[in-house]
Structures are given as C-alpha cells and as structure tokens.
Amino acid sequence: MGGALLCLVCSLATAAVQPIRIGVPGAFTGGSAPMGLSMRNGIRLAAAEINRSGGLLGRPIELVERDDGGLPARGIKVAQQLLTQERVVAVVGFVNTGVALAASKNYQDARVPVMLAVATAAILTRQFPLHGNSDNFIFRVAAADDLQAPLIVREAVQRSAYRKLAIFADNTNYGYQGLMELERALGQHGLKPSYVARFNLQERDMANALLQARNAGSQAILTYAIGPELAELANTMARMDWKVPIIGSWTLSMSNFIDNAGPNGEGARMVQSYIPDEDDSGRRRDFLDGYQWLFHTRRIPSPPSAAQGYDGMKLLAEAIRQAGSLDGVAIVHALENLRQPVAGVITTYKQPFSRTDHEALELNVPVIGKVERGRVVYAYPADKLRQ
C-alpha cells in the first residue's frame, strides 16, 4: 500500500512539472534561413526569460523546433508531427508565406493557436471566416503585406516623387502576394507599374528583365523577394551601371542580401518593424544585449524576425497566463481580449488583437530602413525618435 501511494505521489509530482510544449516551425536551412534562425533565437530568448521567472502556470516552457526548409510539403509534415507526435499546445513561427498557407489549416482544424512571427501574406490571418461560435486560431506579430506595400509605395511616390516604378517579385507565394499588394497600392495613387518581372528562386540571370525595366523608363525598382535573389538583382544592376533606387519589403534587411550584394546593396530602402541601434535603451537595449549574450554574436541576421519571434512568444505567454489553461479556445479568447499590456521589443502591445482583427502591428508601427555600410539603419531621424 505504501509503495503504491509513493508511486501515486511521484506520478502526480511529475505530472505537475510537465513542460508546456510550444511548436516552433520555420525555415532554419535554405535561402530563408537568416529569417528562420533569427526568429528561432528570438523565441528562445523569450522562452528563457519566461522560464527564469517561473514559467507559465507553474510549468516550464519547452520549445519543439522543426525545420521546414521553406518547403510547403515539408511544412505540412512538420505540422502533422507537431500536432500528433509532439502534442504542442500552441505554435510560434512560420517564415515563408507558401509554407504557412499550406500548413495553417492543420492547426486551425486541430484548434491549436498559431502566432505567425514572419510570414506576411495578408490572407493568412483572414482565411478562416468566423461562423457562429467558430474561432480563428491564426494570429500575427509581423507587418502583413497589405501594410508593407502602401509604405513601400508611399516611400517611392510621396517621399521620392517617382512615377515610373518597376516591380520585381519572385515566383513564390510570397512574391505573388506582394506583387498584388504593390499593384493595389500603386493604383491608389493612380499609377500602374512601368514594368513587372517575375523570377525563380536561385535566379542568376536578371539582365534581360532589368534591361526592359530600364527601357520602360523606370525610376526605381520595387521588390518582393528574399536575400539571395535580391542580391543578384543589385549586382546585375551594378554590372549594367544602372543606378536607380531599390525600395522593397522588409527582406532587403536580410544578411544574405547585405553580404552578397556588398557595396551594390548600399542605399536599398525597406520597411522594418525593428532596427537595432547603438542608442537603444530600455526594453530594446535589454533585448539586444540578451540576444548577443545568449547566442554569442554581435549580429542578428534578420533583426525584425528576431524581434517578432520574441514578441510573439511573449504575447502567447501572456494569453496562457490570462486563460489559466492550455485549451486552444481559451488561449484564443485570451489573445483577443488581453487585459495586461505586453512589453515587447517592437512596441508595447495594448489589446493588440480582437475577435475580428488578428494583426498585432498597425500602420504607425513600421519604419523605413536603409542599408548603410553593411548594416540597416534608420532612413529618417524622425522614425528613430518615434520608435
């Protein structure tokens, strides 16, 4: 009897400290790896801070990380793994739009909350319409494409007074969604693209498309692609001695654009949710110092990805605390009705979500960055002061 009782006590004690398993799917290899690895590190840093403070509901967080390589088919397999084998209670992650589009239904059907930390297609948080008592389990803490595109166009049309703008977008879902949003944003200014180019991943010949864009009188290039192909674009422009600005989505801040383009990437401008700065203080200084200490590096390959991953984990954690439960529906309802502000890197989140709006970032949050001497800095002093 005593042995049985001891076993029961041990079993209950073990159950009481079982970790809360959070899935972290993302591209940790391939061309999107700078985003994926930075995102993962941001999530790890947030989880480490939460665990140092006692965890959630008296239990530690355990991250279950899986590499989808930026491939939609692998993303579906990762989702199935995380749901059926790893039994995660929620997910923070997703780098590539195509992967998120392919895999998000698995989580929605399983009623497991997802915090998108990088993938930006506008449709992602709106693809599961609300009917009656149904819930949408997809949230985001990143600048969606329908938020970025108007800022890109505003930078080109209002700030720079360009009227002839070419669009270069890759042939992924990311590029397609971005192209649509850029065309829509140009249309709001009464403009159409001077030229549109689509190209494949690992494209190594952009000269013909750039020649046509130049012949169309394009004054600047608007981009929706990722680092390696963006570098090829900048390098080809340099070989052609065609000096027009590159203005694009946040991926122009990726390390594999800046490194591979070298001096040819100087001056490229992009939308950013977060720019590390030597004058940072408070929460931003703590985040940067913590990242550099924990991961033994002075450089973040994709700073917005790291900050968004960090903030996404913090928002999810606060929802779990408020819900007092690991039930997916309870976590969703808590996210939609957060009572306490959440101090993040990008901003302090005060009721960032509602039942009908699952986007944490609004139009007034992102800023414009530019590549200067191999790193991204604020393009405008006013943005630095505002952030």
Features from the language model and the residues they span:
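Bacterial N-terminal signal peptides
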Residues: 2-11
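Extracytosolic ligand-binding ectodomains
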Residues: 15-387
